[in-house]
């Protein structure tokens, strides 16, 4: 077993399945009597407490002496094995669900590559797709006609445009400058400062966004769900990067850059059906992610109960 002692990952423990040597940043831990997997779970459960014991200085470090003197509960070996078995079973549940999630995500990626490009057509649809410049489908909206009481929205690569109150990080802004912010309506798309990395974001909310963003609104009839998926596809992001070669963090993709890229315009009925399929895939992925998070919380609860003697494990024999 090893415990990493430096930097942001200090305090991280791992059980080695092979014979190995470790560098000076790691402490090698050998269990002379007892269950090594139980020790691993104890260290995992004590992660934050161990980190707080780090040396101070230019770089906070752990050393062998600190780890050696760290006190943990150490029941008899049979109980250790029982507890380790329970937690290992929970780990396997999480691992299996994470593998299923990876498969679902790969399936979604494949569907996007096939359905959003017309490589694979749905039954009942055979009309040729049109390809037109994006500025024939979307226009840039600069609407600052608001009273600044609308909610401030932020761009995220995983959730699209959301209220700033839902973003984990604390983003500062000057309330006196809100009059310069652009109005966004539900169903609009937004080009953010990170769109060259994560595509163009869709807004399910009405609000206002930074003047650094470009707000896009359809000027012809479309299914927003189709373009919500299309603008996040790896194929489109690659094309966007080619069109704006040289742009780096902090620089905006202009509407003119966006508008010159040709995008597909399938029949509206086909747009809807493709969007439904991909939305269903998203829903399945979301449910599985929530299930995995619930299993991780269950494991944390088990560790708190079993590794602190709040609940004892019955041992026969």
Regions found by a protein language model. Name each.
Residues 17, 21-22, 28, 135-186:
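Sequence-specific dsDNA recognition surfaces
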Residues 88, 172-178, 247, 279:
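Short, solvent-exposed loop/turn positions at domain surfaces
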Residues 1-44, 180-236, 254:
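A short beta-sheet element
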Residues 83-94, 122, 274-285:
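Hydrophobic structural patches
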Residues 20-27, 43, 55-78, 194, ...:
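A short glycine-rich beta-alpha junction/loop motif
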Residues 89-92, 96-132, 290-317:
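Short amphipathic coiled-coil heptad-repeat segments
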Residues 69, 77, 122-145:
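Non-catalytic DNA-recognition/assembly elements of restriction-modification systems
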């Amino acid at each position: 077993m090893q415990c990493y002692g430096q930097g942001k990952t200090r305090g991280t423990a791992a059980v080695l399945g092979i014979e190995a040597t470790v560098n000076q940043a790691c402490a090698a831990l050998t269990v002379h009597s007892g269950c090594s997997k139980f020790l691993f779970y104890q260290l995992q459960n004590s992660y934050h407490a161990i980190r707080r014991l780090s040396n101070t200085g230019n770089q906070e470090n752990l050393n062998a002496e600190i780890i050696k003197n760290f006190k943990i509960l150490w029941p008899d070996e049979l109980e250790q094995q029982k507890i380790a078995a329970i937690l290992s079973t929970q780990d396997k549940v999480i691992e299996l669900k994470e593998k299923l999630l990876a498969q679902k995500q790969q399936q979604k990626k494949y569907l996007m590559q096939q359905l959003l490009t017309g490589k694979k057509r749905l039954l009942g649809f055979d009309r040729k797709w049109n390809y037109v410049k994006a500025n024939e489908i979307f226009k840039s909206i600069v609407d600052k006609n608001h009273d600044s009481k609308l909610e401030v929205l932020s761009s995220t690569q995983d959730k699209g445009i959301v209220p700033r109150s839902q973003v984990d990080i604390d983003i500062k802004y000057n309330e006196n400058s809100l009059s310069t912010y652009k109005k966004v309506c539900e169903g609009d798309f937004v080009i953010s400062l990170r769109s060259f990395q994560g595509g163009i974001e869709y807004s399910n909310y009405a609000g206002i966004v930074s003047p650094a963003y470009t707000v896009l609104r359809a000027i012809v009839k479309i299914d927003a769900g189709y373009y919500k998926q299309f603008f996040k596809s790896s194929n489109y992001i690659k094309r966007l990067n080619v069109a704006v070669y040289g742009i780096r963090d902090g620089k905006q993709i202009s509407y003119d850059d966006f508008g010159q890229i040709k995008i597909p315009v399938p029949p509206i009925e086909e747009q809807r059906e493709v969007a439904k399929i991909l939305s269903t895939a998203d829903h399945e992925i979301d449910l599985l992610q929530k299930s995995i998070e619930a299993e991780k919380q269950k494991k944390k609860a088990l560790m708190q109960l079993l590794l602190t003697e709040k609940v004892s494990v019955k041992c026969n024999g």
